[in-house]
Amino acid sequence: NDNWAYHKICTDHYDTSFFSIVNESQYGTYSHCYLTEKTWKAIFNFHPVIIVGAKHSLKYLKERGFDTFGDIFDESYDEIEDGNERLDRILNTVGNFLENNTKTQLVDLRKKILPRLIHNYEHFWGSFRDYVIDDFHTKIKGIK
């Protein structure tokens, strides 16, 4: 089918950048975290993520076995309840990171974190995928 080419994921921007700022669908105050393909695409393209999303988005990833990069980025924004304050902290985090790292430093940092990026990729396609499928089946069985 020729329409499949339309759905191809462009990866050029992942190959030419260091991290992704992911604008998730949920941003306000929610009782649970729901991550979309926006976050998953960054992860399976070997990118650290800064998530502009609901509170505890990074916590959600960590609880499911993914590595986040609190040693590189200030991830305290993930704990902030107020959406405006959280966005301000994210902007400061990105600004500080960009101001304090040269291209040469980013190349070195990329090499240093590559094993963690590979872990996230393999985890996404491995045990996490199985978790999602099992969770889906459990929810389907619960529908009456």
Question: What are these model-predicted stretches?
Answer:
Residues 1-22, 28-36, 40-144:
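Pol beta-like nucleotidyltransferase catalytic core
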